[in-house]
């Protein structure tokens, strides 16, 4: 209870209360008040002291002691009339240019934006003649009439010529679709999809889930399909984040990189890295790729936000691109429901990756665009089982995928059109209706399922991937529109190459400079991506045209350097197993199969020598007594003498067999010794999967085995029997 005559305390209490900054740390913990805070709180509680007549005896600390009526005097100093902060125009221009470069660089982050004059940058970007609502502030009469208050009106043009030029420029840049002031006649007819299933991912509920994830996350990860990265991007969401949420970090994850060649993955990473940080990823619980690099990147983002206890990472993207699979891969166990169909994730959910990083799974969202129904189906947005006429989309599958891949997948050599292909496939797979008619509906669903799940090899080539056939010709202009792997007319291709050759002869030097600039730019971009793309286990088998592009020398150098860096860090045994995998596509263009086999044999022999050295070092560390070593060497010399005497005699049958075995041993040395786990796995594979089959082989059931010939016991049965006898 406060004393009735207590007027507040201005000094510091020396007791053990919270107003003593020097008290012993006890129940208060670490966050105790400091001396300045205690003085400030005491100041709030103070009251001036007055006598019985109401005159102030003791004023407050922050009150002035100057008597009332005294004339205040300001010190005459030039600083009162100068600017508080002065910056030169050249310095401001330099700061603006440097800041613009940093803001456009996807691999740089501005740490303290609040302490920088960001308003100067944004205001200077807008032109002086930006359109404003001038009539609301200055009327026409106050500018041009007899009551005008301005000497010179602010006009866009100073003369008729400039006015004509401005009118022509505005006419050329006019877009009727973007004109919101245009009066449109509403006829009540709109262009919409025929079926509701083609509107999946566009409902208000799904978009509400998306905005929840974006608002709750500090880092937004857009998952893309490596087969068609530009087709699965969402430019609307990217523009929304850049305009409305510029403080949130956006990165790209190129998932399903095991379905495309390695060079295409590398080129797409280089192209997409110009906009946002991009990582190649393969979602798999058993054999993932890019998991360590992704977790390291998230940790770096966590270090940027030191003011927060934890950060949230939201995963967005098209349906069926693998958002939930990426989260399961990062956690190394199933925490999200996954399925090879679209729409498995219904609502957003939080997953804990580590103490300071949380992951948010989001349903797939599709922005309404001009994509046809076939494009929507082939992107995997729609479930195949719900399509009423799946045979209408088979023609696009046959156009986008190469015929050699189709024939290799379905064992069909040739076809005339989509219907002919479906009929042959139905006859081959036995999908027939009554009367032997082919079941077109079921077969077309099979093909679409194979397309969505990656069983048909297909990928969209990155920009600048299709170059002229002559290696001496320089490439075309950088960053063109990506083209799909379709079969073109050979006559058209020959004419195009001839035209390109004629143009390249006339303009050879400038195009060569452009190609050098583009290669150097590619090298700078790929130098930032610390990923060994040679470790990607590519599943589909591509042809020679798709495996190695025409101009990939700049990327191969970076790949080899990245491999050398990682080989120094990792164990050689692991590298041997990874380099033996046939899926790595790092061989040069001119290598044939013999050269590849020769290179693999050299690598195997190299690692075999390394293992032998390791074994020798291991046994050399064991110390043997001197007496025992002398006895062993004496026995060894005697055995060597006897073997030399026996070798003079004629070789026997056993000796011949032994020599034959010794000759076969060097060829088997290169083979790797199987571990105990691999031997047990091979034994399990040889055994039959059915239960109770061996019973009929060893027993006489229904007089089928009248002689009762028991088969030889396995090693496991012999071991158990001997163990049982020893116990007795």
Swiss-Prot record:
<comment type="function">
    <text>GTPase that associates with pre-60S ribosomal subunits in the nucleolus and is required for their nuclear export and maturation. May promote cell proliferation possibly by increasing p53/TP53 protein levels, and consequently those of its downstream product CDKN1A/p21, and decreasing RPL23A protein levels.</text>
</comment>
<keyword id="KW-0539">Nucleus</keyword>
<dbReference type="InterPro" id="IPR027417">
    <property type="entry name" value="P-loop_NTPase"/>
</dbReference>
<dbReference type="InterPro" id="IPR050755">
    <property type="entry name" value="TRAFAC_YlqF/YawG_RiboMat"/>
</dbReference>
<dbReference type="Pfam" id="PF08153">
    <property type="entry name" value="NGP1NT"/>
</dbReference>
<keyword id="KW-0547">Nucleotide-binding</keyword>
<feature type="modified residue" description="Phosphoserine">
    <location>
        <position position="504"/>
    </location>
</feature>
<dbReference type="GO" id="GO:0005730">
    <property type="term" value="C:nucleolus"/>
</dbReference>
<feature type="modified residue" description="N-acetylmethionine">
    <location>
        <position position="1"/>
    </location>
</feature>
<keyword id="KW-0007">Acetylation</keyword>
<feature type="compositionally biased region" description="Basic residues">
    <location>
        <begin position="718"/>
        <end position="728"/>
    </location>
</feature>
<comment type="similarity">
    <text>Belongs to the TRAFAC class YlqF/YawG GTPase family. NOG2 subfamily.</text>
</comment>
<feature type="compositionally biased region" description="Polar residues">
    <location>
        <begin position="10"/>
        <end position="22"/>
    </location>
</feature>
<dbReference type="InterPro" id="IPR006073">
    <property type="entry name" value="GTP-bd"/>
</dbReference>
<feature type="region of interest" description="Disordered">
    <location>
        <begin position="538"/>
        <end position="595"/>
    </location>
</feature>
<comment type="subunit">
    <text>Interacts with LYAR and RPL23A. Interacts with the nuclear importin-beta receptor and, at a lower extent, with importin-alpha.</text>
</comment>
<protein>
    <recommendedName>
        <fullName>Nucleolar GTP-binding protein 2</fullName>
    </recommendedName>
</protein>
<feature type="region of interest" description="Disordered">
    <location>
        <begin position="636"/>
        <end position="728"/>
    </location>
</feature>
<keyword id="KW-0690">Ribosome biogenesis</keyword>
<feature type="region of interest" description="Disordered">
    <location>
        <begin position="462"/>
        <end position="521"/>
    </location>
</feature>
<feature type="binding site">
    <location>
        <begin position="361"/>
        <end position="365"/>
    </location>
    <ligand>
        <name>GTP</name>
    </ligand>
</feature>
<feature type="compositionally biased region" description="Basic and acidic residues">
    <location>
        <begin position="498"/>
        <end position="520"/>
    </location>
</feature>
<dbReference type="InterPro" id="IPR024929">
    <property type="entry name" value="GNL2_CP_dom"/>
</dbReference>
<dbReference type="InterPro" id="IPR030378">
    <property type="entry name" value="G_CP_dom"/>
</dbReference>
<feature type="domain" description="CP-type G">
    <location>
        <begin position="207"/>
        <end position="368"/>
    </location>
</feature>
<feature type="binding site">
    <location>
        <begin position="317"/>
        <end position="324"/>
    </location>
    <ligand>
        <name>GTP</name>
    </ligand>
</feature>
<feature type="compositionally biased region" description="Acidic residues">
    <location>
        <begin position="553"/>
        <end position="586"/>
    </location>
</feature>
<keyword id="KW-0597">Phosphoprotein</keyword>
<dbReference type="GO" id="GO:0005525">
    <property type="term" value="F:GTP binding"/>
</dbReference>
<dbReference type="GO" id="GO:0042254">
    <property type="term" value="P:ribosome biogenesis"/>
</dbReference>
<keyword id="KW-0342">GTP-binding</keyword>
<dbReference type="Pfam" id="PF01926">
    <property type="entry name" value="MMR_HSR1"/>
</dbReference>
<dbReference type="InterPro" id="IPR023179">
    <property type="entry name" value="GTP-bd_ortho_bundle_sf"/>
</dbReference>
<dbReference type="InterPro" id="IPR012971">
    <property type="entry name" value="NOG2_N_dom"/>
</dbReference>
<feature type="compositionally biased region" description="Low complexity">
    <location>
        <begin position="480"/>
        <end position="489"/>
    </location>
</feature>
<feature type="region of interest" description="Disordered">
    <location>
        <begin position="1"/>
        <end position="33"/>
    </location>
</feature>
């Amino acid at each position: 209870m406060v004393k009735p005559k207590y007027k507040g305390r201005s000094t510091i209490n020396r007791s053990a209360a919270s107003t003593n900054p020097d008290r012993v740390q006890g129940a208060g913990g670490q966050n105790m008040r400091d001396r300045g805070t205690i003085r400030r709180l005491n100041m709030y509680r103070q009251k001036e002291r007055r006598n019985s007549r109401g005159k102030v005896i003791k004023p407050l600390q922050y009150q002035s002691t100057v008597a009332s009526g005294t004339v205040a005097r300001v010190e005459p100093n030039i600083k009162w009339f100068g600017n508080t902060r002065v910056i030169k125009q050249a310095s401001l221009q330099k700061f603006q240019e440097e800041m613009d470069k940093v803001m456009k660089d996807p691999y740089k982050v501005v740490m303290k934006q609040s302490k920088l004059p960001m308003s100067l940058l944004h205001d200077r970007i807008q032109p002086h003649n930006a359109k404003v609502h001038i009539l609301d502030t200055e009327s026409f009469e106050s500018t041009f009439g007899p009551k005008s208050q301005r000497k010179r009106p602010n006009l866009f043009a100073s003369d008729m010529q400039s006015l004509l030029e401005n009118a022509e420029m505005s006419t050329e840049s006019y877009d009727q679709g973007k004109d919101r002031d245009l009066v449109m006649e509403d006829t009540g007819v709109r262009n919409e999809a025929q079926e509701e299933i083609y509107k999946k991912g566009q409902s208000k509920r799904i978009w509400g889930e998306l905005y929840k994830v974006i608002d709750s996350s500090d880092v937004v990860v857009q998952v893309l399909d490596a087969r068609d990265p530009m087709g699965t991007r969402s430019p609307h969401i990217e523009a929304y984040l850049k305009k409305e949420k510029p403080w949130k970090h956006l990165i790209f994850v190129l998932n399903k990189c095991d379905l495309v060649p390695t060079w295409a993955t590398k080129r797409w990473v280089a192209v997409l890295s110009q906009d946002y940080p991009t990582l190649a990823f393969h979602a798999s619980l058993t054999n993932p790729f890019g998991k360590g690099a992704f977790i390291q990147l998230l940790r770096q983002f966590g270090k940027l936000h030191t003011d927060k206890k934890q950060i949230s990472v939201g995963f967005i993207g098209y349906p069926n691109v693998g958002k939930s699979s990426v989260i399961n891969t990062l956690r190394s166990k199933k925490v999200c429901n996954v399925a090879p169909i679209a729409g498995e994730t219904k609502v957003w959910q939080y997953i804990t990756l580590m103490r300071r990083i949380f992951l948010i799974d989001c349903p797939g969202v599709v922005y309404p665009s001009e994509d046809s129904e076939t494009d929507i189906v082939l992107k995997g947005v729609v479930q195949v089982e719900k399509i009423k006429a799946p045979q209408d989309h088979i023609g696009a599958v046959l156009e986008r995928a190469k015929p050699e891949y189709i024939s290799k997948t379905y064992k069909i050599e040739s076809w005339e059109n989509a219907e002919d292909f479906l009929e042959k496939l139905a006859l081959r797979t036995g999908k027939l209706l009554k009367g032997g008619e082919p079941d077109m509906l079921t077969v077309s669903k099979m093909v679409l399922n194979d397309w969505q799940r990656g069983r048909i090899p297909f990928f969209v080539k990155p920009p600048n991937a299709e170059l002229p056939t002559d290696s001496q010709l320089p490439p075309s202009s950088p960053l063109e529109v990506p083209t799909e792997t379709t079969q073109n007319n050979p006559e058209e291709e020959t004419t195009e190459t001839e035209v390109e050759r004629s143009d390249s002869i006339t303009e050879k030097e400038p195009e060569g400079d452009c190609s050098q600039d583009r290669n150097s730019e590619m090298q700078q971009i790929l130098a930032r991506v610390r990923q060994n793309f040679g470790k990607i286990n590519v599943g589909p088998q591509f042809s020679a045209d798709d495996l190695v592009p025409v101009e990939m020398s700049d990327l191969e150098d970076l790949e080899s350097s990245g491999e050398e860096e990682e080989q120094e860090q990792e164990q050689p045994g692991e590298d041997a197993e990874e380099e033996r995998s046939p899926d790595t596509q790092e061989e040069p263009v001119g290598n044939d199969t013999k050269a590849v086999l020769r290179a693999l044999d050299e690598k195997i022999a190299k690692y075999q020598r390394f293992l032998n050295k390791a074994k020798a070092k291991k046994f050399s560390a064991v110390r043997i007594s001197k007496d025992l070593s002398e006895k062993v060497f004496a026995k060894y010399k005697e055995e060597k003498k006897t073997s030399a005497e026996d070798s003079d005699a004629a070789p026997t049958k056993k000796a011949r067999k032994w020599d034959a075995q010794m000759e076969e041993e060097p060829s088997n040395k290169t083979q790797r010794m199987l571990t105990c786990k691999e031997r047990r796995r091979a034994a399990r594979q040889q055994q039959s999967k059915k239960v109770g089959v061996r019973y009929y082989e060893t027993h006489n059931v229904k007089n089928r085995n009248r002689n009762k010939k028991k088969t030889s016991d396995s090693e496991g049965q012999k071991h158990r029997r001997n163990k049982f006898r020893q116990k007795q």
